[in-house]
């Protein structure tokens, strides 16, 4: 207890003596922060007033945009004729696709040649799997389990010598 009173208690008192001084300094800084916060609030209120006028402008522009969209819809009706012209332009593209189709037919022929080679490899892998599977089965303890009952049969062997003296 002497160590506690002489070393620990005085250090704790020093810690608490320093903290009130720091708290006073922090308290002085808080009013400054509040002023800054108030300024920020005032600044945010002013743009809000400006923002209120902006939505009215946006609404007005929105009506103009609606009118423009309606005008574009009217213009879209005569545009249907160029769409038919675009369909005619697509027909030559279909012919070009037919020309490229024979090239695609050649590629599958090459792929077909590769497939038999892959098929030949697969049976080899299956044979390996079968061989590997057969080896562990022979070594498993389950095959040794039937041998254990065979060991128990010699326990019956003493009974047979007892039967042998009866014959003699």
Swiss-Prot record:
Protein role:
May be involved in intracellular signaling through interaction with PtdInsPs and calmodulin (CaM); may keep PtdInsPs attached to the plasma membrane until Ca(2+)-CaM reaches a competitive concentration subsequent to an increase triggered by a stimulus, thus leading to PtdInsPs release and subsequent activation of InsPs-dependent signaling cascade. Binds to microtubules and inhibits tubulin polymerization. Regulates directional cell growth and cortical microtubule organization by destabilizing microtubules (e.g. in cotyledon pavement cells).
Record's subcellular location = Cell membrane; Cytoplasm, Cytoskeleton
Instruction: Give the span(s) annotated as 7 X 5 AA approximate repeats of V-E-E-K-K.
Output: 26-129
Tell me the organism: Arabidopsis thaliana
* Name this polypeptide is given: Plasma membrane-associated cation-binding protein 2
User: What tissues harbor this protein?
Assistant: Mostly expressed in the expanding cells, specifically in roots (except in root tips) and flowers (at protein level). Also detected in cotyledons, hypocotyls and trichome stalks.
Q: Which InterPro entries match?
A: DREPP
Q: What is the lineage of its organism?
A: Eukaryota, Viridiplantae, Streptophyta, Embryophyta, Tracheophyta
Q: Provide the GO MF annotations for this entry.
A: 1-phosphatidylinositol binding; calmodulin binding; microtubule binding; phosphatidylinositol phosphate binding; signaling receptor activity
**Which regions form coiled coils?**
56-77
The set of disulfide-linked cysteines is none
Entry GO CC: cytoplasm; microtubule; plasma membrane; pollen tube
């Amino acid at each position: 207890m002497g160590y506690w009173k002489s070393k620990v208690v005085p250090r704790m008192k020093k810690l608490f003596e320093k903290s009130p001084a720091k708290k006073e300094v922090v308290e002085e800084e808080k009013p400054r922060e509040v002023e800054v916060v108030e300024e920020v609030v005032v600044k945010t209120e002013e743009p809000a007033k400006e923002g209120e006028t902006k939505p009215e402008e946006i609404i007005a522009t929105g009506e103009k945009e609606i009118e423009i969209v309606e005008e574009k819809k009217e213009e879209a009706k005569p545009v249907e004729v160029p769409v038919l012209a675009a369909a005619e332009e697509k027909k030559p593209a279909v012919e070009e696709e037919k020309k490229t189709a024979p090239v695609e037919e050649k590629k599958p022929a090459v792929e077909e040649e590769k497939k038999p080679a892959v098929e030949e490899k697969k049976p080899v892998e299956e044979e390996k799997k079968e061989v590997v599977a057969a080896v562990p089965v022979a070594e498993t303890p389950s095959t040794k389990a039937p041998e254990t009952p065979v060991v128990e049969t010699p326990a019956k062997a003493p009974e047979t010598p007892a039967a042998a003296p009866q014959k003699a």
